[in-house]
Amino acid sequence: MSVVERRQINAAINLRLSLLGLPHPDSNAESPDAILVEPLLARQRELSRRLKDRLSAPDLRIQRFLDDYLADCDEHPQLPRTTLVLDEPGLARGLSLPVDGDEFHSDIVASYRLVNGVLHNPKHDRRTTAGVFHISTGGLPIPQDKVEVDKNVYARILARAFQAPDEELALPYTANLPEQAHCWASLLMRPTVLPAVPGRTTEKSYEVHFIVPGGLMCNLDFVEGIFGNAGDPYLPENDASLDPDSWTGHTGCVILAPHLTTMTKKSLGMPHYDDATERQRRDGQCWRHEDDLYNDGKAFKVCARDERGVIVTVIADNYFGYCKKEVKTQISYSANLLGGAEEEHSGGAEVYPAWNLNQDFTDRTPDDFTLADVISTNRELLDVRPEGYAVYKPEPNIVFIPEHSHYSMRTQTISWTAHGAEQTIKLLAGKHYLSPDGYRIHAKHREMDATQWHLIGTSSRAVTCHKPATVSGGGKSEISKSISDAFVFGNAFSHDIDSAMDQVQALFDTDFTNRFADASRNGTDHRPVLSIDRSLGSVIKLLTPSIQYNDEYNAFLEGIEPDVKELAFTVKRYYLPEWGEDWRSHFTVGIMNGRHGNMVRLDGKKIITNMLRVGFREDGSWRLFTLRPDYSPAVKVQTEDDITASTVTPPWEDAEGLPRKYVTNCEHLLFQRPDDAIHRGYDKQAEFDLASGTDTFISNFEPLTHEQARDLLTDVQAYSEFTKPVRKLIERVAAMPDDQSPEFWVCSDDPRHLPDGGRSKNPRYLQVRPTDSNPELTTVADVAGKLARKLPLAGHAPQPIDVVAAGRRNNPPEDKVPALCAYNPLHYMELPELFMEYISSMTGKSPSTTGAGSEGALTKGPFNALPAVYDLNAALLSYALTDYDGWLSSAGYIGPNARVDHDISMLIPELFSHMGPNDRNTKRLISEGYLEKMQDFDFDGHRVLASRLGYRINDRFVTHYFGRIFLHPDVVFSEEMLRPELQDEKIFADSIDVIVKTHQRVAQMYFDDGTVSLACPPIRALLEIMAHGASAEGWTLDSPEFRKLFERESVLASDWYAQRLDAKQAEDVKQAEEGVERLKEYIGRSDSGSVTGRLHLADRLRELEAQLTYERSPEYRQSLVGTLGRQPRFV
């Protein structure tokens, strides 16, 4: 924050403190400005005093809910009537630190103003999930995995939440003033619940009001960064009820109250252990000793909620993660009550495959795409140049090039024919050149040699990957990270160039026509290796062993030395037809000490190769594999990170197409944990983020002084290991005098020092969403995608999900952590097996968890205020209606011996981006032998139910599809990785037993709490099979009648799906009716005239009445077919 911005924020803060009559730095100021506005402020304070009992619109909704919900209780808690309202972004940041200082300390938080942002270290450096989530009785069913709290106890907790001690109410902003301000503070936000899909849905959000003691301004700064600021709740412009089209109809409230951990159970009216029920004893809702503390004095959160759509949560801790996850919880609550929407624990990205085009490329745009059409449709957005190309006005680095143009890096030109003559422009670095179908070309230099430039071509059609239900450590965030950070660069190598080239020539002269195992295919393929009719991919397949080839040919291939084969691929990659037979003269090695070297050169320049790590050997060394020379890392546009709002509708571009899923990221800033940043120079993104900004929200790092920066600058070894942004930060801070503000900074490799002498394992910061930090890349992708679909460049054009691939964290047996390592790199599961996986959401040992177990259905267990069965019903429809295939990728380990960390997580999006829709069709993959069905087997006297793991990829799949990325795809995954049972059959069997037992244990909970009765028929039958081995009808997992329940046609024809659609129509009608009633009531008030006109409420009312008429109609009910509908009953 600049000095000017800080002064503006401070002025705004002082004004608001003055309005509340609270002390502030200008309290005694006699400046002309202060004298001028004081009478106005005095009058406003008097008006506020007379209206002190008036609640804002959202608080009125919350208070009415509490009054009714707790009507039969002894306590009747009241919301604070006066709070410091944070009605503008940035106020919380300014209030979280002293106006005249750089640090603030209380019993529960230590805060520092930094050169690179702000640092807030709460008392507890992490959240926990065990025993934290408590729910009040009297509302919707309480899941078995949550703590059930008597409604009277909840009322007493809520009442005490508003009795914060003075030290927690003290504003950090006035901490150093002679008289400190004490108050409550509040922030209104509108997180997204339903994404907008043109012609299908409008974006809808719910409202949530955070109310916190003044000493916890940093928590409001945190959530405001992630979810935004919805303004002053007292203003009609911000009253959600006056804009029904954008509101889900639901309201949340979150109260922070860290002081509640000192309450005794007895003081809350809990029963003695001898008088308690079994559930109360299990949940710790009773006492043995009079001084027993509630929840043993540990952090907890407790909420009350019912079907009316209001949820009120008290959080007895100030760690930031609880705040974020509570909003996630409430988004999920709103999505379920609204219907037609899901909140998902998911990562995701639009993945655009890319290729290294070398130095020359001729565009092959299909004939039905022309630049003339693009210009005609988007003339107002394009600056058309006389040569016949166009520049995109909103982003001038985007240049539209005519079809069939030629790009040359050698001459640095782009040429085409227009107006009967050849036109030429200079090909510039930093520009994005788009063909009429959206194919993108840009110039790039090699990583190891800035003098070597080549062209990169990027597809205009993304494969949108969605990674839901991914357990901790399963690679949720890795799906959107660029794989290029994992590259290792080298040079093309030959230990004896003359011999190698002789062998390559012999390969080129080989007759390959009789290679097939199927004799009928022999004698049909006569294409020479260097023919323009044979691609590099075709040559890689030609020289890679395969079950399609006969034994003799496979033996021949096995006998080719790897570097000879690689040289053959290299020659093919760079071969130009004009060379004719003389390809050898272009490939040489240097002369060193009078001898041939080993680095292969093309026309005198070293040929650089890219390698990728795919796991580790047992000794810890890296498994490196050479990438195809025409492969380039996919361009990724992040679409999801953690909290996703999604919907399923018929595609907005094609009313006859299969329903598709559309998603949106609910977060503006991303709460990142840079675990690897402790290794200097390794996490380049984290080092850039933490060192380059001046306004970054940071937590659980150690505050450092200017003197420590000078010390680090002189430690040349440590200093040199950092990336450039950190080195520049160190230099800048080292040059600052000790007393210059800000007095502190943080370094990416130095997490917070804890009282026990250790370091925090949970360093955190808020990262600017990549789509916002790199808007040019986002814009280019959006424009390219619209060109490919022939859409106007203006307007919202969301892309549907193409691939669904969840992630699992695998581990070998260790201490008390059981084996969970039966998966190979990539599995496909049909819906029954997939939902067994989703229901159990098993996790092994990971950096984020303390051990093995279940993270709850769809991994939402710790963040779900509702029975998980609601989410399962909707999630099932999101697959059954869309025919999405369910993939599952592995992280951590493959089998007990093959450690892979996140290497596969990073690789899977690249794989799918190079597979077309037909390639990804699992029915075809199964029928053609690319996927292997897992079979049950007997081991050590018992049946091992391996079939629950569905299908897994095999060597044929790897050779064929990974051959689009790697030069030697057949060796990327060993046989022991593709078939983990070969590593250790006992551990493999134990892993599957753990899976089956977890299925049984987790499913049983739905019977214990009775929520199985709320499951749709397919989920109910599946839970019965998981828990008891058979459904009530006697079906097993393999019964055709059972499996038919999951088929699309069966679902569409079912009564239960029809009931969901009826329930959704009824809810929409009810909300519209209530909206009409609220608008009429407001417009009819005597004091609403100016507001009615300013907000165009009469127009809104007419639109809503027309919408209500439509929603009551049979046509609206029919339009809901293909959507998720709504849970018919919640109790």
From Swiss-Prot:
Any one Gene Ontology molecular-function term assigned to this protein's record: phosphoenolpyruvate carboxykinase (diphosphate) activity
Keywords: Decarboxylase, Lyase
Signal peptide: none
Reaction equations catalysed: oxaloacetate + diphosphate = phosphoenolpyruvate + phosphate + CO2
KW Lyase (keyword) present: yes
Tree of life domain: Bacteria
EC number: 4.1.1.38
Biological function: Inorganic pyrophosphate (PPi)-dependent phosphoenolpyruvate carboxykinase, which regulates the carbon flow of the central metabolism by fixing CO(2) to phosphoenolpyruvate to produce oxaloacetate. Can also produce pyruvate and diphosphate from phosphoenolpyruvate and phosphate.
Subunit-level organization: Monomer and trimer; forms heterotrimers with PEPCK2 and PEPCK3.
Membership in a protein family: Belongs to the PPi-type phosphoenolpyruvate carboxykinase family.
Protein name as catalogued: PPi-type phosphoenolpyruvate carboxykinase
Natural source organism: Propionibacterium freudenreichii subsp. freudenreichii
